[in-house]
Amino acid sequence: CIRDRSTDGSIEVIKEYAGKVDYWVSEPDKGIYHAMNKGVLQAHGEYLNFMNSGDEFYNNGVLQEVAPSLDSDIVVGKIVHGTEVWGFHKEDITLMDLIRGTVLHQASFFRKELFDENRYDESYKIVSDWKFYIQTLTFNNATFRNIRSIVCRFVPGGVSETDAGTRDMERKRVYKELFPDRMMKDYIRLEKVESPLLELIPELNKTAGLHQMAYKLVCALLWVHGKIKRVRVK
C-alpha cells in the first residue's frame, strides 16, 4: 500500500489492518504514477492491480472469481461507476479502441513482467496509464482478455474526469511521442466518429450504386434535420 501522507484517514485504517498488509509506506510522492511505480518495485506477485484511494474491490470474492481467468498479459473486467456498470465490451482490443477511450487500470490485472520493459511515465499527470496500454498492447503485442466480472467500485470525479483540458493536451503529446504524424492522420480523423452507420460501410462498399444512394439519403436527412432545428429555434 503506497500513501502520500494524505490526511483522509486512510493511514489509520492501514494501521488497524497492518497485520494483513505485506508492505505499506506513507511518504511524499510526485504524483499518482510515481506512487504506482513505487508499488511495482515492491510487488512480488504474478499479476498486479492498481486500486486508487477511495476505490474498492466490488466484493470480498473478486480475486477468487478472477483468478481462473488470469491467462493473458492484461485481463480486464468491469467497474461500477456511480449507479452504472462500465467496461470494455469487445472480445479483443484495437488501437482505435484505445484512441477513442481507455481501459481503467482499477479493473485491470497486469502480468508483472510487463513492467520489466515499461513503467508508468511520471512526466504525465493524467494519461500515463493510457500510454502504458498503447505501449504494451500495440508495440509489445501483449495478450489481452476481457472478462465479465465486476472488479471494483470506482469513485467518480477523479482528475481524469474533471480536467479534460490537461487530459486532451497530454494525449496529443503521447501521439507525437509514439507515432509519426503521417501514421496518425487517419486515426485522429476517426477519433470522434461514433456511429452505428460505420458497421454498414463494408456492405455498402460492395455495391457502388447502393453506397451513393445511402450517401444521398443521409445528406437529405441531415438537411431536413437542420431545417427542423431552425424552425424550432424561431
Cite the ranges covered by each PLM segment.
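Acidic donor-diphosphate engagement hotspot in glycosyltransferases and nucleotidyltransferases
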Residues: 10, 36, 59-65, 128, ...
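Conserved nucleotide-sugar donor-binding catalytic segment
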Residues: 81-174, 178
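Short aromatic/hydrophobic "clamp" motif used to bind/position activated sugar donors
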Residues: 48
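Membrane-proximal basic amphipathic "stem/tether" segments
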Residues: 180-182, 186-234
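Glycine-rich, basic loop-to-helix element that forms the pyrophosphate-binding segment
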Residues: 13, 26-43
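Short, surface-exposed alpha-helical segments at coil->helix boundaries
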Residues: 7, 11-15, 165-169
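Conserved donor NDP-sugar-binding/catalytic core segment of glycosyltransferases
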Residues: 56, 60-88
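A conserved acidic beta->alpha catalytic loop
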Residues: 3-12, 52, 56
